[in-house]
């Protein structure tokens, strides 16, 4: 009887220990996901999140992956100011890359997460050649550009990051900056499995986009 009772107690203790370990692992995983990374080093660049509006931003994914972007195109002031406004408002925080095509681009920034956009958000003028605006920034790998509908002036919040050089987009989309550190994250997202609508089967969520200061590490 004592042996049987001891066996039961031992089994219960083992189950409780295993459960505690699993809960600890889960808690650790959730902590990684929930943490805002305020400073760090990516590809030799040291970044620090700042409340000041700058020309560089940190895109943090929910899994902790980081991309650093420079908003560098002086020919697209409207586009850059629009993007900065949405970063300030926190528009992009918690949104997903809803459309991913390997060897082409990854697209996100839609508050609805569908690609149809939010009609309540104002559109901006498309700053590209076919719309009467000079824009010499070619759509090479890592370039960030505004997504839009057929109307050349229909861009609002959605953007895409080029995965493979796509100069056929030049002249028709407002390219306004480039990923200068963390291109491996673009590669990683671009390679995820997708459904027939190019939507990732595993959610690719942006934790936040924040302004940063940058220096060489």
List each model region and its residues.
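Cyclophilin-like peptidyl-prolyl cis-trans isomerases
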Residues: 5-9, 16-217
